[in-house]
Amino acid sequence: MKILLLLSAMLFPTLALLGCASPPTDQPAASTVPPAPVVSPEPAVKPQPRDVLKQMATYLRSLDRFTVRVEKTTELILPTDQRLHADQTAEIAIQKPNRLRVNFQNLSGGRQLFYDGTNFSLYTPEANVYASAAAAPTLDETLDLLANQYRISLPVTDVLVANPDSRLAQNLTSETYVGRILVGGVPCHHLAFRTPEVDWEIWIEDGPRPLPRRLILTDKSVEGSPQMAAALTDWDVAPQFATDLFAFNPPPNAEKISFVDEAPAAK
């Protein structure tokens, strides 16, 4: 089964406040060169890729809420064989078991997705229009509903579900521990996996917070084997959410419309 790394986006960047003080006059000023990241040496025995994947999944399951920013690039292959790349940025906020908010960003104002455990709504601020429908009782079921029935895709869905290791590890034909590398200044385990239809790589933070930091997927089932790459940044694993963050209240004069791309219901 092909891995579904669905796109769209949500999350809120974290701001850090850095304090500083003037050095004593009888001492030299501190260097302005930032310290290099502390990177532990390569392990004597390479970890098993599936074990690292399970550590990530266990940690994500332990979080009752989080936010993340996803920047995704999808490769498109034209009939002329020219390759184009479409970018998407999403900020995602999740509160388990059944709350979701996604802000899809673009130059025209983007879109906003709300899921409050009962209904979901998609709002386009520029046009001041929205559509709403009944949702499933859990986040996993709602993500599947959005993708399969309404054709609303979120980025990196497979790492947002309750059991990401089970979904990601389906139909594996090989797994490789590539090594350790810095991703955005963060030491990460680089893992590579293959299935009959998809080759995919994942970079997982090394340390007490095994968070996914980067994903690359190569779709071998499509001629030309296009790729999708996603960077997951600005993780906040203990955010404070406003009480109304996940509830959609239509703005004044907003027009309610139907989901024009709704797929036929399964019989």
Language model region names:
Residues M1-S8:
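Bacterial N-terminal signal peptides that target proteins for export
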Residues L18-G19:
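C-terminal motif of bacterial Sec signal peptides marking the signal peptidase cleavage site
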Residues S22-V38:
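Bacterial Sec signal peptide processing site at the extreme N-terminus
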Residues A44-V52, Y123-P187, F193, N249-P252, ...:
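Flexible, processing/modification-adjacent segments and terminal tails
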Residues P37, P41-V129:
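N-terminal mature ectodomain segment of secretory-pathway/periplasmic proteins
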Residues E71, S121, L168-A263:
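Gly/Pro-enriched, hydrophobic low-complexity segments
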Residues S22-P23, A93-P155, S221-M228:
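An acidic-aromatic
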